[in-house]
Amino acid sequence: MSINLDNEELKNEDLVANMRKDYRMGELKEEGLLESPFKMFDMWLTQEIELKNEGAEPNAFTLATCSIERKPSARVVLLKHFDHQGFVFYTNYNSRKSKELSENPFASMTFLWTQKQVRIEGSVEKVDRLESEKYFKSRPRSSQIGAWVSEFQSSEVTKQHLEEKTIEMENKFKDQEVPLPPFWGGWRIKPYAFEFWQGKSGRIHDRFKYVPTDSNNDNWITKRLSP
C-alpha cells in the first residue's frame, strides 16, 4: 500500500535546527596525545566506561561499509575485542555488511562518546574460526541460538517465523552445547588511520589524526586537523 506523506507535518522537523550543546568537559592538546593510537583509544574508552552513563554502550560503534556499486551503508555494532592487530566485531557472514566487506574490504568505525568521538579507518579480514569459536562459547545460550536463527534471515520475515525457528533450534540443540554456525564469525578491522575529536566551547573543537610511518603500523605521527 502506498501513502503520500509529502505534506504531513513532522513533530520535530524545525526543532532540530535549534538543538545544540556547549561542550565544556575538556580539551585535547598535542602534549596530551599518547604515542600509540591504540593506547589513546584504550584510555578514552576507559574514561567513557568510568562515566557510567545510564543506557550508554561504550563499545558500540557505527560501522560504515560500501558496496561494489559504491553505495554506502552504516549500522551500529558492538566491539568485542581489540589489540594492536585491530578491532573485532562478530556478525552473520550472509548479512549485507559481510557481503559488502567481502566485495570491498575496507571500513570505517565511529565511536560517539560523551563530548568525544573516535573515527578509525582500515582494511578488513575475517577472524580465524578458532578465535570465533572461543568468543561464541562465551556468549549466553540465548544469543548462541539467536545466531542460528539468523541463518534464515531474508529481506522480509514475520515475527511468527522467527519464533518458530527459535523453538526449532532450541529443540535441535537441547541438552548439548550450541556449536558455532558455519555462516557466523568475526571481522577484524586493521587500522591505517585514527582521528580523535574533543568537543570544545564555541565549536573550535580539538581534532587530531594519527597515520602510520611504516607498513607494520609500529610507529605513528599525529597532526592537528580543522575542527
Curated annotation (Swiss-Prot):
GO terms for molecular function: FMN binding; pyridoxamine phosphate oxidase activity. Its cofactor is FMN. Catalyzes the oxidation of either pyridoxine 5'-phosphate (PNP) or pyridoxamine 5'-phosphate (PMP) into pyridoxal 5'-phosphate (PLP). It comes from Dictyostelium discoideum (Social amoeba). This is Pyridoxine-5'-phosphate oxidase. Belongs to the pyridoxamine 5'-phosphate oxidase family. GO terms for biological process: pyridoxine biosynthetic process. The keyword Flavoprotein applies. It catalyses: pyridoxamine 5'-phosphate + O2 + H2O = pyridoxal 5'-phosphate + H2O2 + NH4(+); pyridoxine 5'-phosphate + O2 = pyridoxal 5'-phosphate + H2O2. It comes from the Eukaryota. Pathway: Cofactor metabolism; pyridoxal 5'-phosphate salvage; pyridoxal 5'-phosphate from pyridoxamine 5'-phosphate: step 1/1; Cofactor metabolism; pyridoxal 5'-phosphate salvage; pyridoxal 5'-phosphate from pyridoxine 5'-phosphate: step 1/1.
